[in-house]
Amino acid sequence: MKKLLIFALAAMGMVACVKEEVTLLPQGDAISFESAFIDNATRAAVDPSTTTATLNGFNVWGFVKEYDGVIFDGVNVTKNNDVWSYDGTQYWVPNQPYYFAALAPMNSANWGISKATDAAAKLGLGTVDFKNVDGTEDLLYAKEMMTSKGLNEPNGAVKFQFQHLLSKVKFTFKNGFPTETASIKVTNVKMTVPQEAEIDLAQTDYSKAWTSYANTTTLSFGDVEKLAYTQSAEVAYERLTIPAPAEEKQPEDTLETVKFIQLSAEEL
């Protein structure tokens, strides 16, 4: 019995030693996001583009040291009273390189992502496929690279500057009739554009990074008020479209066209 008791005490001592040797990886302050700014904000009254003021959420991806060190994988980041927050707090590991990327609108059914699987992810995130339904939904992307500071040093928040990945289209008409007694009315302005395409986020010129165009959709720009002699006016709505570079030949059924459904002249 005495031998068994001594053995049991020795075993307990070994377990205690093992527990004492377990150490935790040092961590810094919590990773946070703030001041999500959208570049090239527009000023039109009826404008579908997302602005800094109207952006209320985005999905974020984050990697530490290498691409395999995933800390965020499409996590929802939302704004409430100008404060950005997410579930499942992550903390900075001191003196490590970090890579962040974000897409908006958050959780949209019109975009999907195929993430890169190697170091190329550091240049972007992967390939995004986008479907343009009616030209009223924007597509935004941002990335940020930074190195965390030492232990007990504040890192500050990750600040994204979002870029518009789509092009904005509007039409302006001018009454060019040579007589002051003529006015014109333009109604039901439409435009046929590519509906689906993919963009490689590792590229630097996003306007030329679109490929794999498929299908078409018709965007409606509304009407133009009656134009008197030499008067100019814009269509009622602006719309967003997938960029289609002129130097890149597209399939014939996805070429952009403008349709003037009605064009009439009236006397004042």
Regions found by a protein language model. Give the residues of each.
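Positively charged n-region of N-terminal signal peptides that target proteins for export
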Residues: 1-4, 19
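Exposed beta-strand face motif in extracellular beta-rich ectodomains
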Residues: 4, 96-100, 266-268
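Sec-dependent N-terminal signal peptides
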Residues: 6-9
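C-terminal motif of bacterial Sec signal peptides marking the signal peptidase cleavage site
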Residues: 13-16
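Short, low-hydrophobicity acidic/polar segments
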Residues: 19-196, 209-211, 220-250, 259
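Solvent-exposed beta-strand/loop surfaces of large extracellular or lumenal domains
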Residues: 199-214
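Cysteine-clustered segments with highest specificity for TGF-beta superfamily mature ligands
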Residues: 251, 263-268
